[in-house]
C-alpha cells in the first residue's frame, strides 16, 4: 500500500495566503471607504474569492481589525518586557510610548485611518498593552515614583488619550510631522505631571 502524504501544511499555507489576500484587500478598501462603509461582499469581490472563503478565514469584518490589535499587542508586550527590566516606572512609560510610536509608524497612516472609527470597541478593551501599563502605574504608585492622589485608571486613560490623540492627528495631517518626536514631547509633559 503506498504511503499517504498528509496535506495539512499545504492547506495551511493556502489558508494563510488567502487570509493575507483578504486582509490586504480589506485594508485597501477600508482606507478608501472606511470600516463602516466597506462590506464583506465588496472585500470578496475585490479579492476575487467567494464569500464562503472569507468566512472560513475570518468570523466577521471585525476579525480583520482584531488581527491588527493582536499583532500590535504581541509586538509591544513581547519587545518591551525585556527592555523594561531595571527601569523605573517613568522609564517604562517612556519606553512604552517609544514602542507605541514605532508600532503606529510601521502600521502606517492608511491602516490607522481605518482603526479610528467611532464604535471601535478595542479602544475601550483591557488589551495586553493596557495590562502592561496598569502594572507599571501600580508599581510606580506603590514605590512613590508616580502620584497616588490620581487614580491609576485616570492616569492610564490620560496616557491613551494623549497617544491616540496624537496618532489621530498624525492621520488627519497626513503624516506631516514626526510621530515619534511628537509623542516623546508629549510624554515629557505627561511624565512631569504624574511624577511625585
Predicted regions located by residue number:
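Basic, helix-initiating cap at the start of DNA-binding domains
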Residues: 1-33, 41-46, 63
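C-terminal peripheral helix-coil segments that are non-catalytic and often amphipathic
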Residues: 1-6, 86, 102, 131, ...
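Conserved hydrophobic residue
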Residues: 36, 146-147
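Short hydrophobic/aromatic patch on the recognition helix
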Residues: 47-58
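Alpha-helical DNA-contacting segments of helix-turn-helix folds
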Residues: 58, 64-72
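Amphipathic alpha-helical packing segments from all-alpha helical-bundle domains
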Residues: 74-77, 119-145, 153-161, 168
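Short linear capping/connector segments at secondary-structure termini
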Residues: 112-120
Amino acid at each position: 500500500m503506498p504511503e499517504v502524504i498528509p496535506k495539512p501544511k499545504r492547506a495551511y499555507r493556502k489558508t494563510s495566503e488567502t487570509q493575507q489576500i483578504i486582509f490586504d484587500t480589506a485594508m485597501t478598501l477600508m482606507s478608501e471607504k472606511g470600516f463602516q462603509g466597506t462590506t464583506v461582499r465588496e472585500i470578496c469581490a475585490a479579492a476575487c474569492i467567494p464569500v464562503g472563503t472569507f468566512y472560513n478565514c475570518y468570523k466577521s469584518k471585525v476579525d480583520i481589525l482584531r488581527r491588527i490589535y493582536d499583532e500590535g499587542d504581541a509586538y509591544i508586550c513581547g519587545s518591551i518586557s525585556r527592555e523594561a527590566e531595571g527601569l523605573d516606572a517613568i522609564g517604562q512609560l517612556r519606553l512604552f510610548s517609544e514602542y507605541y510610536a514605532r508600532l503606529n509608524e510601521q502600521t502606517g497612516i492608511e491602516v490607522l485611518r481605518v482603526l479610528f472609527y467611532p464604535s471601535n470597541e478595542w479602544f475601550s478593551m483591557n488589551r495586553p498593552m493596557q495590562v502592561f501599563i496598569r502594572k507599571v502605574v501600580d508599581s510606580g504608585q506603590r514605590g512613590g515614583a508616580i502620584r497616588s492622589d490620581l487614580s491609576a485608571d485616570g492616569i492610564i486613560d490620560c496616557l491613551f488619550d494623549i497617544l491616540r490623540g496624537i496618532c489621530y492627528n498624525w492621520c488627519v495631517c497626513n503624516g506631516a510631522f514626526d510621530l515619534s518626536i511628537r509623542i516623546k514631547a508629549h510624554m515629557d509633559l505627561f511624565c512631569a505631571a504624574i511624577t511625585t
